Amino acid sequence: MSESKSSRQATLRYQMELFLLAVSFFSRLPVPSDLPYSEERMNQAGRYFALVGVILGVLCALVFYFTQLIFPDSVAIVLTMAFSLLLTGAFHEDGLTDMADGIGGGMTVERRLSIMKDSRIGTYGAATLVMALLAKFVLWSELVHLPDFWLVIVVAYTTSRALAATLIYDMPYVSDSDTSKSKPLASKQSSSEVAILLFTAGVASLFLGVIQTSFIVIVLFAFRFAFKRWLTKRIGGFTGDCLGAAQQLSELLVYLTLIAFYQNI
């Protein structure tokens, strides 16, 4: 009996450590400095990426709630967006920028991958980043008057990270695994890990409503199919930057989908 209890405690502790690894990878939130790390653990932590999205979404929703008590909605939106960038270290935005530079500026697969590794921002990346941030501001401005706007943020942050993480499941990793920060994530996911991602995203979305969730699922599945085919054609697989781009683009698609839904009911 005691052995069984000890085994359960060890399992729970291990899963908590995986979750904290996911938090440390995707955010600037503090985690214990003695947290065990290995590439295998980091790869397994991918199952909790959507749950990290829940945490980040809730924190951003709280910032918006308190700032809009003091400032106009537009100012509260800008402050919340700034907080989100600080919270994540602009991790996903950086991926979107690098992917845009690489695929936009490279004429061959090798050149595209080489440009993605360059830390400098080019024309394609700068334009894409500006458009993405502007789009987020405009879309939030359209949704801000919904009584459950805070929940929209949580759902978008959660589902977009789930979608990005699932690309690891059925796409080859094509970056230089010796130098890439995303190397630990490059291994294939198990079906159970994908199921955890989808379950987390599904539960969060259902709080918006079954119909809204259905529309979001349809749109994101269509996007994933198209984005996967596009990446395969352009670079033959995915890189860490592509995962960041997938998160950013799918987050914007969630907002667009909900605007279209509420506009036509």
From Swiss-Prot:
Positions of transmembrane segments: 51-71, 72-92, 121-140, 203-223
Pathway annotation from the record: Cofactor biosynthesis; adenosylcobalamin biosynthesis; adenosylcobalamin from cob(II)yrinate a,c-diamide: step 7/7
InterPro entries registered for this protein in UniProt: CobS
Cellular component per GO, a single term: plasma membrane
Keywords: Cell inner membrane, Cell membrane, Cobalamin biosynthesis, Magnesium, Membrane, Transferase, Transmembrane, Transmembrane helix
GO molecular function, one term: cobalamin 5'-phosphate synthase activity
Top-rank EC class of the record's enzyme: transferase
Biological role: Joins adenosylcobinamide-GDP and alpha-ribazole to generate adenosylcobalamin (Ado-cobalamin). Also synthesizes adenosylcobalamin 5'-phosphate from adenosylcobinamide-GDP and alpha-ribazole 5'-phosphate.
HAMAP family (UniProt xref): CobS
Protein name per Swiss-Prot or TrEMBL: Adenosylcobinamide-GDP ribazoletransferase
Taxonomic lineage of the native organism: Bacteria, Pseudomonadati, Pseudomonadota, Gammaproteobacteria, Vibrionales
